[in-house]
Amino acid sequence: MILNRLSTLGIITFGMLSFAANSAQPDIKFASKEYGVTIGESRIIYPLDAAGVMVSVKNTQDYPVLIQSRIYDENKEKESEDPFVVTPPLFRLDAKQQNSLRIAQAGGVFPRDKESLKWLCVKGIPPKDEDIWVDDATNKQKFNPDKDVGVFVQFAINNCIKLLVRPNELKGTPIQFAENLSWKVDGGKLIAENPSPFYMNIGELTFGGKSIPSHYIPPKSTWAFDLPKGLAGARNVSWRIINDQGGLDRLYSKNVTL
């Protein structure tokens, strides 16, 4: 499973430098580093049956990293069984450099009447002393902790963005259907219904003036948002969706069905 860490997805690995267990250790020095890469887009709209799309990745570190890219299913718990190919799947990216990934559909069956959701996850793998792909001692020194560090914790950040597979049969964009969301309160939850064929990616959501953690609403489906306490009698819900470019659309507001 990919662990959720703040606004990105992270995989945590631990490395301990050796020290004598039976010797006196008045102080154990701890150190930690995060290793991540940036993706040039906040989401990818993949036209179904397209030959492929390109997305850029950048190494923000001051030493080289290995870039590993994978496609995961909607719940992000396993690699997608649908035939998407990312090339190159694994490569070295030097310090402060940028490169491109190509994502291509290689078959598979997708619904033609609504979008499908996958995730592109890109991870920067830091070098270790024994790695032969790091041929520069200076780069290794930049990565490795001081010799007096007793415990060294590594955070290899797995940065994921939505890969929205959009059939050519769909007309329009999500923002043209955003106001059609319907809302009701049931069992202490705020239920949103999305009748459109598009994923509605909620960027901002308030109910009774209080902010609600946002989430996407699948096409032709519903999503239940947990409500905080103290909202008895509240009726007004306001929301903004995230558009195809990653920006917030206009504000919509309705009274819920009780």
UniProtKB/Swiss-Prot annotation:
Q: What domain of life?
A: Bacteria
Signal peptide positions on this chain: 1-20
Q: Name one GO molecular function term.
A: protein folding chaperone
* UniProtKB keywords: Chaperone, Disulfide bond, Immunoglobulin domain, Periplasm, Plasmid, Signal
User: Which Pfam family, any one of them, does this sequence belong to?
Assistant: PapD_N
Q: Which residues are connected by disulfide bridges in this protein?
A: C121-C160
What's the main place this protein lives? periplasm
GO CC annotations, alphabetized: outer membrane-bounded periplasmic space
Q: Does the keyword Calcium apply?
A: no
Q: Which residues form a coiled coil?
A: none
**Where is this gene product found?**
Periplasm
InterPro entries cross-referenced by the UniProt entry? Ig-like_fold, PapD-like_sf, Periplasmic_pilus_chap, Pili_assmbl_chap_C_dom_sf, Pili_assmbl_chaperone_bac, Pili_assmbl_chaperone_C, Pili_assmbl_chaperone_CS, Pili_assmbl_chaperone_N
PROSITE patterns in UniProt: PILI_CHAPERONE
What is any one GO biological process for this UniProt entry?
Answer: cell wall organization
- Name the family the entry cites: Belongs to the periplasmic pilus chaperone family.
Functional note: Has a stimulatory role for the envelope antigen F1 secretion. It seems to interact with the subunit polypeptide and to prevent it from digestion by a protease.
Name the UniProt record assigns to this protein: Chaperone protein caf1M
Task: State which gene encodes it.
Answer: caf1M
